[in-house]
Swiss-Prot record:
EC number assigned by the record: 2.1.1.222, 2.1.1.64
Family under the similarity heading: Belongs to the methyltransferase superfamily. UbiG/COQ3 family.
InterPro entries, per database record: Methyltransf_11, SAM-dependent_MTases_sf, UbiG_MeTrfase
HAMAP family on file: UbiG
Protein name: Ubiquinone biosynthesis O-methyltransferase
UniProt xrefs under PANTHER family: METHYLTRANSFERASE, UBIQUINONE BIOSYNTHESIS O-METHYLTRANSFERASE, MITOCHONDRIAL
Keywords: Methyltransferase, S-adenosyl-L-methionine, Transferase, Ubiquinone biosynthesis
Binding site for S-adenosyl-L-methionine: 39, 58, 79, 123
């Protein structure tokens, strides 16, 4: 599969159509705004962001990219949606936060800038591409030896169908209907296998759960629905 082929144009259009609402914390992107502090701290506590060159894969409108830049990282954000990237650039100008946003695939960038990033993040993106294993392999290629890599996605099981699709999209209406396809969700065992195939070492896995009564997210051991993984690219032998 070529870099351009590993793009689901219907998925790109889905987020293009909503791009103008990306930074509205009460919009369809409210969940992203609410989980951002958790995932930002998860990354920063393990990778020490200040001064690091960071790649945010599938950056969308720049919520995470901009947050990492505010922590002192030098961030490159990539996405295939031009509208979200335009929103991200405009918001960066308004907020005075510098992020290098580019319209490209991770596979293309890996060819041009191999082993050039200290940290790679790929959050809430893998379940939206035809070949997530290709994305992970390219993330590994673009990372420096010793780099930290972070991935987040949604588990594939009956509970995730109930919570992430029925609950989030139909009952609580936290997300637009059709945001996710259950068959594209990824089991932790599958993600871990792809990490191993890319010669990455899995360091940690954490679940992210939502309490609808308290309306808050927290990290824990429950990986039945949303989860994050931290991996490291091994140093080269001397």
């Amino acid at each position: 599969m070529t870099p351009v082929e590993n793009v689901d144009l219907s998925e790109v259009k889905k987020f293009e159509d909503l791009a103008h609402r990306w930074w509205d914390a009460e919009s369809e992107f409210k969940p992203l705004h609410e989980i951002n502090p958790l995932r930002l701290d998860f990354i920063d506590e393990r990778a020490a962001l200040p001064g690091k060159r960071v790649l945010d894969v599938g950056c969308g409108g720049g919520i995470l990219s901009e947050s990492m830049a505010r922590r002192g990282a030098h961030v490159v954000g990539i996405d295939m949606g031009e509208a979200p990237l335009s929103v991200a650039r405009l918001h960066g100008l308004e907020s005075g936060v510098s992020v290098d946003y580019r319209r490209t695939t991770i596979e293309e960038l890996a060819e041009a800038e191999a082993e050039s990033f200290d940290v790679v993040t790929c959050m809430e993106m893998l379940e939206h591409v035809p070949d997530p294993a290709s994305v992970i392999a390219a993330c590994a290629r673009v990372a420096k030896p010793g780099a930290d890599l972070f991935f987040s996605t949604i588990n594939r099981n009956p509970k995730s169908f109930l919570f992430a699709i029925v609950g989030a999209e139909y009952v609580l209406k936290m997300l637009p209907r059709g945001t996710h396809e259950w068959k594209k969700f990824i089991k932790p065992s599958e993600l871990a296998a792809w990490l191993r195939s890319a010669d990455l070492d899995l360091c940690e896995m954490r679940g992210m759960t939502y309490n609808p009564l308290l309306k808050e997210y927290k990290l824990g051991d429950d990986v039945d629905v949303n989860y994050l993984m931290h991996a490291v690219k091994p140093l080269k032998d001397a």
